[in-house]
C-alpha cells in the first residue's frame, strides 16, 4: 500500500518532475532537482481509503503553502500570495488545480482568486458532466491540472496537464487564465480548447485532433462564461452557411472543410439540438458511455472506420436518422487521402462504404429529427476574443428560433437588385439557398445576400429553408420572373 505514495518535485518550467516512492517508516531521499514537493497517495477507489500520516521535516526547504478554495478565503489569499517564497504557487479547487507563477499572480490577482477558481472548477465540472462522469459513485479522485510555463507555445496540452505560457510577460495568464480577464469576450476558449485535448479521445480521429476538442471550448463558453456574465455573448461558433457556401457546395468532402464546421457540425450541433433545445439532455452522457464501452474504431484514431462510425453512433444512440444533415456537409463524399496530424494517417472511404453505412441506419427505420440541424448555430449576438462586437443582429438559424419552433411566414418573399437578393419576412427561416440547373450552388444566413460569386442563369431559384424537417423548402424567387 505504501508503495503507492510518492514524493514529487515539479520545477518552475512546469514540464519536468522527479518521483520518489515512499515506504512505511523513515524515508531518507536525495532530491535531484529544485521545485515544489507534493505527496501523492494513489488508492484503489473501489475500496475504502485508509488514512495515513506523512511527516516531512523541513530540512533545507521552505514552506510555500497553497490556496484551497474549500478552506481559504480571498483574505487568506492576499496574505499567502504576498508572502509566498517560491516562484510557483499552488491553487487547489474542487475540480481543478493550478500551479502558476507567483510573480504574475501578485501582479494580476493580488487581492482575490476565488472568481478564478470558480471559473476553472465550473469549466471542468461542465466537461465531466457532459461526459456522464457524474453518473459514477466516485467519478474522479483527482483534479484537472494546469501549469504556467516559462517558455513554449501560447497554450498546450499534455497527457498529464495543460500548460499556459508566460513568455508574453504574463499576458496569457492575465487575459486567458485569471479572472476577470478570462471571463471577457471569448477568452475562456483557450482553457477549454486545451483541456478539451485531454477529453476528446472518445470522439476524435486523425484530421479532427484540433477540431473535436473545440466542442469542450464552446461548451464552457455557453455553460460557464455566459452564465457567470449573465448573457449569451460569449461564443466562438460561426454560422454553418459560411462553410456550406465556401467549401461544401464545391463538392469538398467533409475532411477537407476548414474552420468551424469540423467541430461545429460534427459534435456541437448535437449539443445544441439535444441539450440546448431540451430535446434529450441525456444524449451526450449516454453517447460518451457508449464510446467508453465500444470505441469508434478498433485502432485508436483510425480515420476510415471512425468517420462513418461516428455518424452511425450518433443515429443509433439517439435513435434518430440524421442522414440528411450529414449529407448536407458532404460526410459521405468519397475520399482517398494520406495526411499527418500528430501522426500519419490514411483516410479511404469509397462510395460503397458510405452507401452501406447509410443503409444500416435506414434499416433501423429511425424517425428524422424534428429540426434541420445542419443550419443550427449559436453565432447570434457575439463578440470576438478581445470583446470587439462582430455584428449586432441574430443571423438566420440562431438556436433561439429553433427553441421557439418558429415557422416560416406565409408572406416570405424575395426580390433581386443587381447581384443582391433581398428577402422580406424571412426571419424565421433556418437559412436560404440558391439552386441553378437543379443543383444547390449557395447557402446563406441572412435576409440580404450577394449571389455574384455563384452560378446564376434563367434556371436559378431562391428557397427559404424551414427550421422544421416536416416542412419543404419554399420557393421565394425565380430567375426571369418578377
Which residues are covered by each model-predicted region?
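N-terminal low-complexity segments that are often proline-rich with Ser/Thr-Pro
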Residues: 1-2, 326
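Short, solvent-exposed linear motifs at loop/edge-of-secondary-structure regions
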Residues: 32, 87-97, 209-219, 315-339
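Catalytic cores of extracellular degradative/oxidative enzymes
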Residues: 77-79, 87-300, 310
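Beta/coil-rich, acidic/histidine-enriched accessory regions frequently appended to metallopeptidases
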Residues: 306-442, 458-464, 480
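Short, motif-level signal for alpha-helix interfacial/capping segments enriched in acidic residues
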Residues: 41-43, 72, 213
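Low-complexity, Pro/Ser/Thr- and charge-rich linker/hinge segments at domain boundaries
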Residues: 55-90, 482
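Beta-strand-enriched, solvent-exposed domains that form extended recognition/catalytic surfaces
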Residues: 3-67, 410-482
